[in-house]
C-alpha cells in the first residue's frame, strides 16, 4: 500500500505498515463556499496511530484564545476501514482525543464519524462525510476535504510522486502518556512530529496542548507549533526504542508504544 490516504488505516482488521503525512488543501461544510483557513497536517504511523492538527493561519476574534479549527488523534483501535475498490475507501473514526469533546463545546458530534475517500488522478485525495453536531437523531451536516499526500522524509512540503522515497521505510515512532492528570500522544513520521496533550480535569483551553516540529537535513529540530500552558510536559526528544520512556517536565514520562528504529 502506498501513501495515498491522509491516515494509515486498518484494512479488514489487518494493519498495513505505512506512514503518511498529508496537507489539507480545501475544506467545505454544508453549502458554504470551499475555503482553507488553516495549515492542517494529518499524520499516521506504521501501526495506525494518527493525529490531525488544524491551526488557523490568521485567527480572528475569539479564535485567538485557542487558534485551532480542531484537533484530534487516536490509536489503531479507534478506527476501522474497508476498501471499496482501487480508488475508494471507507473509514470510520471514534477519536481518542477530540478538542471539541474535551472542551464540552456546544453542537459537537460525538461517537463514530463515517468518512468516504477517493483518490483523484492528480494524486489528491477527496474525503467526504457527515457529522451530527445537534444530536444523532437531528439534521446531519455534510463536509468535504481535499488532501495532498506529502513526502514525510523531506523537511519541506514535497508532494508524493513516483520519485519519492518508499514511505513504508520512513521513521515511525509513537509516544503515549496516561497518568492521573494527563493523557497525550506524540507521533513522528519521517522528519515530522505532531503531539497532543490533554489535562484530564481541565476542560478549557488551558487543558489543551499542541506540538508540531520538523527535523532538518542536518538533524536540527525546529518547533513549528507550540501551544498550551503545559507544553513543557512534552518530551524534548521524540524518538526511541520500543518500550523506552522519555521524560518531559514535572515528571511526565512518555512511553514509546511503537518504533521502527
Curated annotation (Swiss-Prot):
InterPro entries: Hri1, Hri1_N, Hri1_N_sf. Signal peptide: none annotated. It is found in: Cytoplasm; Nucleus. Keywords: Cytoplasm, Nucleus. Disulfide bonds: none annotated. It comes from the Eukaryota. GO terms for cellular component: cytoplasm; nucleus. Belongs to the HRI1 family. This is Protein HRI1. It comes from Lachancea thermotolerans (strain ATCC 56472 / CBS 6340 / NRRL Y-8284) (Yeast).
Amino acid at each position: 500500500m502506498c501513501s495515498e490516504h491522509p491516515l494509515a488505516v486498518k484494512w479488514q482488521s489487518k494493519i498495513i505498515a505505512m506512514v503518511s503525512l498529508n496537507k489539507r488543501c480545501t475544506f467545505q461544510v454544508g453549502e458554504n463556499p470551499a475555503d482553507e483557513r488553516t495549515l492542517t497536517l494529518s499524520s499516521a504511523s506504521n501501526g495506525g496511530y494518527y493525529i490531525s492538527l488544524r491551526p488557523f493561519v490568521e485567527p480572528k476574534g475569539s479564535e485567538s484564545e485557542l487558534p485551532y479549527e480542531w484537533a484530534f488523534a487516536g490509536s489503531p483501535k479507534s478506527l476501522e476501514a474497508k476498501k471499496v475498490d482501487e480508488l475508494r475507501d471507507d473509514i470510520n473514526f471514534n477519536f481518542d482525543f477530540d478538542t471539541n469533546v474535551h472542551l464540552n463545546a456546544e453542537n459537537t458530534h460525538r461517537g463514530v464519524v463515517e468518512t468516504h475517500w477517493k483518490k483523484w488522478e492528480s494524486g489528491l485525495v477527496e474525503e467526504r462525510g457527515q457529522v451530527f453536531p445537534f444530536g444523532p437523531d437531528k439534521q446531519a451536516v455534510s463536509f468535504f476535504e481535499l488532501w495532498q499526500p506529502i513526502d514525510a522524509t523531506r523537511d519541506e512540503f514535497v508532494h508524493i510522486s513516483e520519485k519519492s522515497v518508499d514511505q513504508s521505510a520512513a521513521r515511525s515512532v509513537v509516544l503515549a502518556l496516561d497518568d492521573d492528570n494527563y493523557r497525550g500522544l506524540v507521533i513522528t513520521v519521517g522528519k515530522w512530529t505532531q503531539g497532543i496533550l490533554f489535562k484530564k480535569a481541565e476542560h478549557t483551553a488551558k487543558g489543551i496542548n499542541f506540538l508540531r516540529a520538523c527535523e532538518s537535513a542536518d538533524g536540527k529540530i525546529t518547533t513549528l507549533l507550540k501551544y498550551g500552558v503545559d507544553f513543557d510536559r512534552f518530551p524534548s526528544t521524540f524518538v526511541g526504542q520500543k518500550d523506552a520512556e522519555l521524560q518531559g517536565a514535572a515528571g511526565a514520562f512518555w512511553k514509546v508504544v511503537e518504533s521502527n528504529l
